[in-house]
Amino acid sequence: MIKLSELHPDKALETLLEGNVSIEISEEESRVALIYRQGERPNTDLGDEFIEILPNGVVRAMTKPMGVYRGNLAVILYCKAQSDGTAKENRINSMLSQLESLVNCKSSGKFFFEINPSNVITPISYNSATGYTTMTLNVEWHTTE
């Protein structure tokens, strides 16, 4: 059984993703996407692509006494839009494809992750204030102990 003080599914998911999502810039060049959890994303000097992991809804205790939990995380993909405001769909789709294989039905530490079957993703949207296009992948988690 897990204690409330150990309830950090975002850290566990970050561990699964860190260093494993690559962005192909050209045939010769690629880079690794940076991963941020809530409260860690800087306000300046963000890369052209990055991923943010945020809590998405409530955490539910599945047992009495408490010890087994379930919840959701939003995994938000950010990609700097082209100069005309259109999305770099190939890059976003590449990131999404990698996330699907890294996250769906995977465990890290005391947590199990799967893509939420009832609310998989949100469509690509553009934020003119930031210049980024985003897509959100909804991930369910539960504790394994």
Residues covered by each model-derived region:
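Secondary-structure boundary/capping motif
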Residues: S30, Y36-G39, V68-N72, M95-Q98, ...
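Small/polar-rich, solvent-exposed N-terminal microdomains that initiate assembly or binding
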Residues: M1-P65, S108
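Oligomerization/assembly interface segments of phage tail-like spikes and tubes
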Residues: M66-S83, G131-T143
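Extracellular/virion structural assembly segments
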Residues: K64-R70, Y78-N104
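Acidic-leaning, charged glycine-interspersed low-complexity segments
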Residues: S22-E27, L46-E49, L96-E145
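Short, surface-exposed loop and linker segments with low hydrophobicity and enrichment for Pro/Ser/Thr
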Residues: T44, A61-R70, S125-T130
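Generic low-polarity alpha-helical segments
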Residues: L13, L17, I51-I53, G71-V75, ...
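Charge-dense, low-complexity intrinsically disordered segments
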Residues: K3-L7, T86, N90, N127
